[in-house]
A protein has these predicted regions:
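Positively charged, helix-rich recognition surfaces that bind polyanionic ligands
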Residues: 1-159
């Protein structure tokens, strides 16, 4: 039992150390840090059962096993702790942290602003259906998050 507790403590310390290093690097490197306002509770929700239309007593596969692994990964990441560290370090360093509505950040083209679910036909590739712009999906989403964060900050400073 003590061995298990020791291993859990070791993992917790490693995660906390990684969070401290990443948050320090971000705060030292950037004046503005824009973060998606993700609802983690919604992200780790279990998939709904899918009843078989031809036999109501039987349920069809709903991807619950794969979703359970993703849920565990999301929960283990400790995002709330990382965001908290970024927040207090940014405040003490005079940096700005902006939370951004996550809607359409991965579907909006950074070139022409066209929003379509079909812009993300593949998980890792973004390809705009209007202008043809192609990019890594995560990079495109990060640019949209930053752009939205800058726009929010500009609106807040004006009015």
């Amino acid at each position: 039992m003590q061995e298990v507790a020791r291993l859990h403590r070791k993992v917790r310390n490693q995660r906390q150390n990684a969070h401290h290093q990443l948050s320090r690097r971000l705060v030292n490197q950037f004046d503005l840090i824009a973060i998606e306002d993700l609802k983690i509770k919604n992200m780790v929700r279990s998939p709904k059962p899918r009843p078989d239309p031809s036999n109501p007593e039987v349920f069809l596969p709903n991807g619950a096993a794969a979703k359970a692994g993703l849920n565990r990964s999301i929960s283990d990441a400790g995002w709330a702790i990382l965001l908290s560290m970024i927040g207090y370090k940014a405040e003490s360093a005079g940096r700005t942290v902006v939370t951004v509505d996550p809607r359409h950040t991965s579907q909006r083209c950074v070139v022409c602003s066209h929003v379509a679910r079909s812009n993300r036909a593949k998980q890792a590739v973004f390809k705009c259906q209007r202008c043809g712009h192609e990019d890594h999906a995560d990079l495109s989403a990060a640019c949209n998050i930053l752009w939205t964060g800058r726009a929010q900050l500009a609106r807040a400073s004006v009015g």
